């Protein structure tokens, strides 16, 4: 005789977990500090989604020499940024900075980590003005040996800081002295005092990673930051007066014809002779 199983079947709950992706970079500044930036995303329901509210831990060093630098919560863009002062940073025997960004895991989000290893270096930017010629001299210095050493044959770019992003002004390659000179255009829009912020950058270098240096100079054209009503113009939000006036006249003429036609139809209907019954 077959036996029936009277026990209730247990429901197996399958919890979906997501593996986060950490994009991690370091930016070495001209004051010898380092910005650590991590962007955390995960593929959720087929869409790459930025993860907010996650605690990212930043450390420097390897194995037994690991030193905690700090913790940052990701913002609405999934980004966590930590600025590290020079006295917080330690290098290995090769003069490299070994950074790690790690996430311990939370709810359905799995743990993850990402490593970045770069040689210690510094980018310097010096403004030079000769008559009407404006230039900046950019120098790349290797600090991994403890003493400054010029780095030749390295590509870099110079930008001007704008409200939302930076505008590239030129690029160059360092010479044997580790220097490159880039010309700056005249009459760039500046702030109310005519100041512009110039940035020298090296991006994604195989040895040094990302480096940045900034300098502010009164080389721009003053642009008022006061809110003023713009004059009426074709390219503005307020058109010239002749445009709405012309439009109003044309629309009045068109709709006026319709009104006259409808009025005449009603008048003709009233004047239609009635047939005797």
Language-model regions, residue ranges each:
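Enriched for extracellular/lumenal, surface-exposed ectodomains of secreted and cell-surface proteins
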Residues: 96-109, 195-210
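Beta-strand-rich structural segments
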Residues: 25-48, 56-58, 82, 130-147, ...
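Glycine-centered loop-to-beta-strand initiation motif
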Residues: 74-84, 172-185
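Short glycine/proline/serine/threonine-rich loop/turn segments at secondary-structure transition edges
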Residues: 88-97, 188-197
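C-terminal single-pass membrane-anchor helix
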Residues: 220-277
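Edge beta-strands of extracellular beta-sandwich domains
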Residues: 106-117, 206-224
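Short amphipathic beta-strand segments in non-cytosolic proteins
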Residues: 55-70, 155-171
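Proline/serine/threonine-rich low-complexity linkers at boundaries of modular beta-sandwich domains
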Residues: 3-19, 111-119
């Amino acid at each position: 005789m077959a036996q029936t199983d009277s026990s209730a079947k247990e429901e197996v709950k399958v919890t979906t977990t997501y593996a986060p992706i950490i994009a991690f970079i370091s930016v070495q500044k001209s004051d010898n500090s380092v910005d650590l930036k991590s962007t955390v995303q995960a593929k959720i329901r087929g869409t790459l989604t930025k993860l907010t509210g996650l605690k990212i831990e930043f450390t420097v060093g390897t194995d037994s020499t690991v030193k905690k630098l700090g913790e940052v919560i990701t913002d609405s863009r999934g980004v966590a940024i930590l600025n590290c002062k020079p006295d917080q940073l330690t290098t290995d025997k090769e003069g490299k900075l070994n950074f790690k960004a790690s996430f311990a895991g939370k709810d359905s989000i799995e743990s993850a980590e990402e490593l970045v290893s770069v040689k210690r270096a510094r980018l310097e930017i010096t403004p030079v003005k000769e008559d009407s010629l404006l230039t900046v001299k950019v120098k790349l210095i290797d600090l991994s040996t403890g003493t400054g050493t010029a780095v030749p044959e390295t590509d870099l770019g110079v930008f001007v800081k704008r409200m939302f992003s930076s505008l590239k002004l030129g690029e160059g390659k360092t010479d044997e002295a580790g220097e490159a000179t880039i010309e700056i255009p005249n009459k760039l829009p500046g702030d109310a005092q005519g100041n512009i912020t110039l940035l020298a950058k090296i991006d994604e270098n195989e040895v040094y990673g990302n480096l940045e240096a900034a300098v502010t100079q009164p080389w721009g054209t003053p642009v008022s930051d006061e809110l003023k009503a713009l004059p009426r113009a074709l390219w503005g939000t307020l058109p010239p007066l002749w445009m709405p006036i012309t439009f109003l006249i044309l629309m009045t003429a068109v709709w006026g014809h319709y009104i006259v036609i409808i009025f005449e139809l009603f008048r003709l209907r009233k004047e239609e002779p009635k047939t005797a019954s």
